[in-house]
């Protein structure tokens, strides 16, 4: 299993101390006992590959959302190991560098707002690369009804295998139409977990029978919003505070 699907994130909630965690999609971790994390070392000293265990006996060491339709998982990391190995742990603070969907709308982020996707799509990045590919897209739908029904924000962006768990961040805007709001800093909007497929049906002209169904990437990515990420992180916090 490849680290490149995993979003690195920091956490500080409810007055609790900062804790290092990985946030990714549930489907990335399911069915595996371990994953390999590739993390940069400080001062450009190369890359470390680290085995991370996902199970203790039959129990998972990671946390998932109680709603089966939410494809989010949180894996705690050992902060002392990160310090000892001198790893460059650049991360999103889930409280201070992220905004839930309601806060985004209040800040002026809506349909058409530009966003970036950061990730390592398989086959598109050289294996020795330490920097992600950045792709530009825009918010396609950010409505309350959309999120309540599907648990997703829709983003017009091309995501590929290997982008599961990729962060979507807002693009800072310093110019806005008079009387409207604009968000002047990059904030985590959510994480990608899949895309809406486009199906094309081929029929035999003589029998009118379906002979083939092709599935293509429609270019609309499904993104779980920050509020759902925080709900999973809070499960982890309650476990270790209790």
What does each model-identified segment do?
Residues 239-242:
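C-terminal recognition in membrane/secretory proteostasis and scaffolding
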Residues 11-17, 173-182:
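Alpha-helix termini
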Residues 1-21:
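A conserved glycine-rich beta-strand in the N-terminal activation segment of trypsin-fold
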Residues 1-2, 34-161, 165, 170-173, ...:
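Serine endopeptidase catalytic core focused on the charge-relay Asp
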Residues 213, 237:
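Terminal helix/beta-alpha structural elements that buttress the NAD(P)+-binding lobe
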Residues 24:
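Cytochrome P450 catalytic-core helices
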Residues 183-208, 214-221:
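Conserved catalytic cores of soluble enzyme domains
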Residues 8-10, 142, 171, 194:
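Residue-level recognition of beta-strand microenvironments
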């Amino acid at each position: 299993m490849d680290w490149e699907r995993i979003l690195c994130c920091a956490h500080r909630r409810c007055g609790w101390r900062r804790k290092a965690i990985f946030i990714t999609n549930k489907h990335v971790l399911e069915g595996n006992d371990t994953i390999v994390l590739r993390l940069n070392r400080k001062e450009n000293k190369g890359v470390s590959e680290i085995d991370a265990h996902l199970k203790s006996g039959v129990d998972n060491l990671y946390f998932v959302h109680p709603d089966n339709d939410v494809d989010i998982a949180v894996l705690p990391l050992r902060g002392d190991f990160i310090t000892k190995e001198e790893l460059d742990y650049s991360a999103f603070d889930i409280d201070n560098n992220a905004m839930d969907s309601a806060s985004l709308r209040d800040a002026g982020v809506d349909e058409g707002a530009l966003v970036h996707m950061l990730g390592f799509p398989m086959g598109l990045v050289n294996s020795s690369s330490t920097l992600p590919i950045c792709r530009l897209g825009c918010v396609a739908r950010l409505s309350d009804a959309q999120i309540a029904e599907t648990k997703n924000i829709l983003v017009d962006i091309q995501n590929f295998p290997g982008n599961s768990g990729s962060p979507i961040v807002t693009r800072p805007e310093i110019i806005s139409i008079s009387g409207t709001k604009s968000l002047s800093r990059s904030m985590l909007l959510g994480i990608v977990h899949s895309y809406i497929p486009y199906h094309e049906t081929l029929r035999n002209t003589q029998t009118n029978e379906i002979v083939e169904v092709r599935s293509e990437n429609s270019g609309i990515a499904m993104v779980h919003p920050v509020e759902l990420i925080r709900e999973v992180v809070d499960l982890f916090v309650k476990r270790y505070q209790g």
